């Protein structure tokens, strides 16, 4: 429209459509703009609608969210509402929450789960095992303290921790995803990663 409005309800689009206003120049399909528009529509979805559609995507990918309790599933879904550009991305972004065992991306594992990182991840595992409060803030502070004690940068611990928990180099906030997974599950996933290293 002439007022530069970028998102309109379908009824208003129909009402405001003006064929003489359509330019004759060659049209181009802007994928980046489509991604942005999808992102905005996802963010605008009511929570129940987003959950229904996201669960459908997880099910289509062979992931059974029903095997987890509703609070866990809701917390996992909340981590992706402001991040994904397309509902088709849901399973790839948070699917790791619904696997009993981490499915490792080979490239991520080769980069992060190295023999050099094993002592760092083992020390972080012990720090996390000793936490009385297992929330995002406590996890972040514990990681920073562990990195300082080992005289390494935070990223030396962040990437192995992320790959151990998710199998991937990308995904939701590390500290928030670990909070959702819970202490026992994070320690289990760390142990599995350490055994591979």
Predicted segments — roles?
Residues 109-165, 170:
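C-terminal accessory/binding modules appended to enzymatic or scaffolding proteins
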Residues 1-104, 166-197:
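Catalytic adenosine-cofactor/nucleotide-binding cores of aminoacyl-tRNA synthetases and other
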């Amino acid at each position: 429209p002439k007022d530069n409005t970028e998102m309109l309800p379908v009824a208003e689009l129909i009402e405001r459509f003006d064929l003489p206003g359509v330019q004759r120049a060659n049209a181009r399909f802007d994928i980046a703009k489509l991604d942005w528009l999808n992102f905005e529509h996802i963010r605008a979805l009511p929570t129940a609608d987003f959950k229904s559609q996201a669960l459908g995507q997880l099910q289509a990918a062979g992931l059974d969210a029903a095997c987890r309790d509703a609070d866990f599933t809701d917390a996992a879904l909340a981590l992706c509402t402001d991040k994904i550009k397309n509902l088709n991305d849901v399973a790839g972004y948070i699917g790791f929450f619904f696997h009993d065992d981490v499915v490792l991306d080979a490239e991520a594992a080769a980069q992060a789960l190295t023999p050099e990182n094993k002592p760092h991840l083992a020390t972080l595992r012990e720090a996390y095992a000793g936490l009385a409060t297992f929330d995002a803030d406590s996890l972040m502070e514990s990681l920073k303290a562990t990195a300082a004690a080992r005289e390494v940068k935070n990223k030396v611990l962040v990437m192995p921790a992320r790959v151990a928990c998710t199998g991937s180099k990308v995904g939701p906030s590390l500290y928030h995803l670990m909070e959702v997974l819970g202490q026992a599950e994070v320690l289990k996933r760390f142990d599995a990663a350490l055994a591979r290293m």
